[in-house]
A protein has these predicted regions:
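Multi-pass membrane proteins that catalyze or facilitate reactions on polyprenyl-/lipid-phosphate substrates
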Residues: 1-278
């Protein structure tokens, strides 16, 4: 029963932190230090990534009309939604950098960089970057205010920022891509939406990679924990995505920058005082 409660808590953390620019993987790694699950290391590696599938389903449900590229309902319009197909090609372009590094160096990165101190440093650095870019953009008008206006060059640049998140836990995939978008003149709302859509192939691919590597030969209890975590992550993600899209219509991302810096300092303090072991 206790492990079920832990899976619920992990699902809540995933659902909240996957979409806010504060690093879901970083929070899960830190939470695991204080409340580890009584499961095999193999299952934990799968759980940490595959739980994200619940969060992906929330994006698919909320933005179905913006991402489904076929028209089955309106006979007066083309069957293929060319604007959505174009969007998906741009998303695939943005996926290339992280996909290449993930396939080649997944095991190395997992072994050497998934540490509390790395998470802390990246929390602070990206937090500072958010404060800087929001101050820098304060009097500027966004160059890209519609999703369809993102160019292939913009998509590739955002993809390079995503690569940083793929390498360093604590960066935040959503944080890195939103930050990249803001730096090249994409509006907050468009940067957030593109980030949500970009998560679909990236997180699905990461989950598939883990399943290919480790399989699903787990106990019934472990599979139950995975299912519970995914369902909770899905429900919480629905609420958080709606909140974020409403929030950034009137506010900037500074609050997340401050949160990251404060949390990063706390984690470093815990590390150097021996509270955290890695």
């Amino acid at each position: 029963m206790l492990e079920i409660v832990k899976a619920i808590l992990y699902g809540i953390i995933e659902g909240i932190t996957e979409w806010l620019p504060v690093s879901s993987t970083g929070h899960l790694i830190l939470f695991e230090e204080f409340m580890p699950m009584d499961v095999s290391p193999k299952f934990w590696n799968v759980f940490l990534v595959v739980i994200q599938l619940g969060a992906i389903l929330a994006v698919v449900l909320l933005f179905w009309n913006k991402i489904f590229p076929f028209n089955f309902t309106n006979k007066n319009r083309p069957f293929l939604k060319y604007d959505i197909w174009t969007l998906w090609f741009k998303i695939l372009v943005a996926c290339i950098p992280a996909a290449v590094i993930g396939l080649l160096f997944d095991e190395f990165l997992e072994e050497h960089l998934y540490k509390s101190v790395v998470v802390a440093i990246m929390l602070i650095l990206v937090g500072i970057a958010f404060l800087w870019i929001e101050n820098n953009n304060r009097k500027k008008t966004a160059r890209v205010t519609r999703l369809e206006d993102i160019s292939y060059k913009d998509a590739m640049i955002i993809g390079v920022f995503q690569l940083i998140a793929a390498i360093f836990p604590g960066t935040s995939r959503s944080g890195a891509t939103i930050l990249g978008g803001l730096m090249i003149g994409v509006s907050r709302g468009v940067a957030a939406e593109f980030t949500f859509f970009l998560a679909i192939p990236v997180m699905a691919g990461a989950s598939l990679l883990k399943l290919i590597k480790y399989g699903l030969a787990f106990s019934g209890m472990e599979l139950t924990l995975l299912a519970v975590g995914m369902v909770v992550a899905f429900i919480v993600s629905l609420l958080v995505i709606r909140f974020l899209m409403s929030y950034i219509k009137k506010h900037d991302f500074k609050i997340f920058g401050y949160y990251r810096i404060i949390l990063g300092i706390i984690v470093l303090a815990c590390f150097f005082t021996g509270v955290l072991s890695i």
